Regions:
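Alpha-helical initiation/capping and key positions within long helical/coiled-coil segments
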Residues: 6, 25, 88-91
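Short amphipathic alpha-helical surface patches that mediate protein-protein
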Residues: 31-32, 57
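TPR repeat positional signature
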Residues: 10, 29-30
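Solenoid-repeat scaffolds in large eukaryotic assemblies
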Residues: 26-27, 33
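Alpha-helical solenoid scaffolds that mediate protein-protein interactions
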Residues: 14, 33, 40-41
């Protein structure tokens, strides 16, 4: 049995907001989904750090540099949330989806 993660739930909520047009809320939800995915991966691999960027770097040593790229996209969604249009959000959404999928794959295996 697969367990739905908080990352998946945030991702679904963000997709719902995107359909309704609440772009700032969308960016925040996508960021939360990515953050939860990082937390799940850190738990899975027993990784600790002073901040989430340290954890992402340590995860990249295990899982590959894509983790850094995915996290960068998610971080951009959050830091530039008031400036992004729907098309850019959809583009960076893919980084979040990849990160959530990676976390689910590793956590549920």
């Amino acid at each position: 049995m697969l367990i739905r993660t908080s990352a998946e739930i945030y991702l679904e909520e963000a997709d719902e907001f995107l359909n309704k047009g609440g772009l700032v809320d969308v960016c925040e939800k996508y960021y939360k989904a990515a953050r939860e995915a990082i937390i799940l991966l850190a738990y899975k691999y027993n990784i600790h750090g002073d901040n989430i960027e340290d954890i992402v770097t340590k995860l990249a040593e295990i899982l590959g540099d894509n983790v850094i790229s995915y996290w960068a996209g998610a971080s951009l969604l959050y830091t530039a949330r008031k400036e992004l249009d729907a098309e850019l959000i959809k583009m960076y959404r893919q980084d979040v989806v990849e990160l959530v999928n990676l976390a689910n794959e590793k956590f549920n295996s």
